[in-house]
Each structure stands twice: as C-alpha cells, then as structure tokens.
C-alpha cells in the first residue's frame, strides 16, 4: 500500500521514499509513499524522476492498481534493489499546469451546476486545456459565452482554493449552498 502524499500536500515537489517492490520485466517501481498523482477522472498522471545512489530514473507513467501506485521507469539503467532509499521529484511545470487546469474545470462545473443545474457527465484534461460534457439537451454558442463570462467573474473574485476529499454523496449539497 502506497501512502498518497499528493492528497495532503499538492505543492510537494520533492520527497523521500523507500522502494518496496520491483517488476523488473515491466520496469515498474512500487514505493512506500509518493507524491506522483496516478491520473484518473480524465486527468493525466504526473511525471518526473526518481533517484537512488546518484542514479536518476525517468518516471514516464504512473498508474493506480488497487492500493498501490505503479511508477513506470524508462531507460536501460539497472533498477535499485528492494529496500533502497529513493528521492522523488515531480516535473513541477507539468504538475502546476495540471493543477491550474483542474481548478479551472472545477470552477466551470460549479458555475454550470449553480446557474443551470447541469451536472458533468464526462471530461478530459491536458496541460492548460480541457473538455467537459454537461447534461444539456442543447448548448448554443450564446450560452457558451454567458457561461464563459460567469466563470471569468468567479476567477476575478480570487477566492481561496481549499482541497477536500469527500465521498461522492456529499458533493451535490455543496453546489446548492
């Protein structure tokens, strides 16, 4: 089981960890803790580096499997042995752009739900761009401009952003307050 550091500190860029398992064939490292987000819900995973004994390993992909986070390593450098201490470091430019995009998409979802009662049915994001699907029968260009203006007004309000991990059944009441 991997301790998910990103859930308590999304600004953590560098961390110390220990290698707890290795899949040599697939070049996957299992760590006791990580700040690498594995992706999910339309959001891409983090990338960066892991290092051990002054050897750097590029993290190309991160996935969640059960209670574990899998860190896929590129290259042909021999992998460290189980129990080795490691240092992880995020590609911070990528993470920060994903964070900004993620927050903007939450603002969009909040405005659309508050003003039109339409829920999100799907979405996908990349660095500084994203797509959201809403429960609208039809969506005209004029309405898109009205929504965009409302979203920009919310951004201009410069509200504090707080991170909370809630069960799904507690989410909708937040949109009605």
PLM regions: where:
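Active-/binding-site microenvironments in catalytic and ligand-binding cores
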Residues: 1-177
């Amino acid at each position: 089981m991997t301790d998910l550091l990103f859930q308590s500190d999304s600004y953590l860029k560098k961390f110390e960890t220990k290698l707890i398992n290795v899949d040599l064939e697939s070049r996957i490292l299992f760590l006791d803790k990580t700040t690498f987000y594995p992706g999910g819900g339309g959001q891409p995973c983090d990338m960066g580096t892991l290092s051990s004994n002054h050897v750097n390993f590029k993290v190309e992909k991160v996935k969640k499997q059960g209670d574990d986070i899998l860190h896929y390593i590129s290259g042909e450098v021999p992998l460290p042995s189980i129990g080795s201490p490691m240092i992880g470091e995020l590609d911070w430019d990528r993470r920060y752009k994903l964070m900004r995009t993620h927050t903007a998409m939450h603002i969009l979802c909040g405005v659309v739900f508050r003003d039109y009662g339409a829920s999100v049915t799907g979405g996908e994001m990349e660095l500084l761009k994203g797509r959201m699907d809403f429960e609208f029968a039809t969506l005209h260009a004029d309405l898109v401009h009205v929504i965009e203006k409302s979203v920009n007004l919310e951004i201009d309000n410069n509200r504090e952003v707080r991170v909370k991990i809630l069960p799904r059944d507690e989410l909708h009441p937040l949109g009605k307050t």
